[in-house]
Amino acid sequence: MSIEIPAGLTELLQGFTVEVLRHQPADLLEFALQHFTRLQEENERKGTARFGHEGRTWGDAGAAGGGGTPSKGVNFAEEPRHSDSENGEEEEEEAADAGAFNAPVINRFTRRASVCAEAYNPDEEEDDAESRIIHPKTDDQRNRLQEACKDILLFKNLDPEQMSQVLDAMFEKLVKEGEHVIDQGDDGDNFYVIDRGTFDIYVKCDGVGRCVGNYDNRGSFGELALMYNTPRAATITATSPGALWGLDRVTFRRIIVKNNAKKRKMYESFIESLPFLKSLEVSERLKVVDVIGTKVYNDGEQIIAQGDSADSFFIVESGEVKITMKRKGKSEVEENGAVEIARCSRGQYFGELALVTNKPRAASAHAIGTVKCLAMDVQAFERLLGPCMEIMKRNIATYEEQLVALFGTNMDIVEPTA
């Protein structure tokens, strides 16, 4: 089936997508409201409604980076133009120094060609419908690939097994000076991560090609065309011999899109099963799913330390966590001076006490065996778990009873300390 894409829609969504990838907002709806309100205000000030114009950053060019700085990354020409790096999240720090990159005005009167591509529903695909693709690599190649991928935002939320599948599936592509890696208007076939080399970004405007930026030994491009079935928005040309790591379209969508969809669905079910979150509305629980991250700890690894400032709240997804506490000024029975006061298993949570009382951590937590936890930062905790706060505060009485039984005192876990 061929679907006619309204003029300007692709550019609008691409610009919004990159803004989300750059800023990682905890509240996506609020961020979208602010983003599109800003666009509308900019258009009103200019006296025209150019919905294809994203006034601060260009989605296919990634975050503006370099801007004349000698650091490696993506650099954009002073005159803003349309480009196709489609990513560049890893250049976000450079973007803060270089300033925002202004996007070009898209001609909304030019009719957009229809886009016909396969539909992809991650829920309909069987788990093993596709055989796993493995491109053998030497230890040196794998190390270089891991280094090149470590700051790519698309891979940030993949667990170790998923990341291993991505690394296995990626293939090395050597390029010569002057070679076109992708061409504007072509269908997207691969996602690319730069290992080494310099590349220019060219965009045709009114039939004339212009260089709008470049990559210097770092960066990635090509994911938006794969995610949204849109043609390439620019041409990427090698300006020196170099090497890229490629990930094919099918593997990209299967691993990145499908696994993210599966993980969201799994976390939705898990969050819904937690009794202390029952007081949240469905929409509030979905917001929790959006902001939680996964952390894996090895046997004996410390998760939180007594006395540290609180920055996260944890829910045990799998494994067991030991909670220990040191009595003030007195060594207890264990060699490390701490006594075990509780254990947490799947569905139980810890780390909330310091967030509720605004005090340093009252206890330490260590992994028993391999432990996987869902973690939520303090800002999201305060914003999203307000309805659950009374339940958590009621637990303080239970904690105090445990401490009195163990130490003969409640350890002042509630009263403010200096």
From Swiss-Prot:
Domain of life: Eukaryota
Post-translational modification: Phosphorylated by the activated catalytic chain.
Ranges for region Disordered: 45-98
Positions contributing to 3',5'-cyclic AMP 2 binding: 276-418
Region (Dimerization and phosphorylation), start-end ranges: 2-153
Modification type Phosphoserine: residues: S83, S85, S114
Compositionally biased region (Acidic residues): 86-96
Entry annotated with the keyword Cell inner membrane: no
Modified-residue entries (Phosphothreonine), positions: T69
GO cellular component: cAMP-dependent protein kinase complex; cytosol; plasma membrane
UniProt entry tagged with the keyword Cell membrane: yes
Tissue expr: Four types of regulatory chains are found: I-alpha, I-beta, II-alpha, and II-beta. Their expression varies among tissues and is in some cases constitutive and in others inducible.
This protein's UniProt keywords: cAMP, cAMP-binding, Cell membrane, Cytoplasm, Membrane, Nucleotide-binding, Phosphoprotein, Repeat
GO biological process: adenylate cyclase-activating G protein-coupled receptor signaling pathway
Binding site for 3',5'-cyclic AMP 1: 154-275
CDD domains in UniProt: CAP_ED (cd00038), DD_RIIbeta_PKA (cd12104)
Function: Regulatory subunit of the cAMP-dependent protein kinases involved in cAMP signaling in cells. Type II regulatory chains mediate membrane association by binding to anchoring proteins, including the MAP2 kinase.
Name the UniProt record assigns to this protein: cAMP-dependent protein kinase type II-beta regulatory subunit
Gene encoding the protein: PRKAR2B
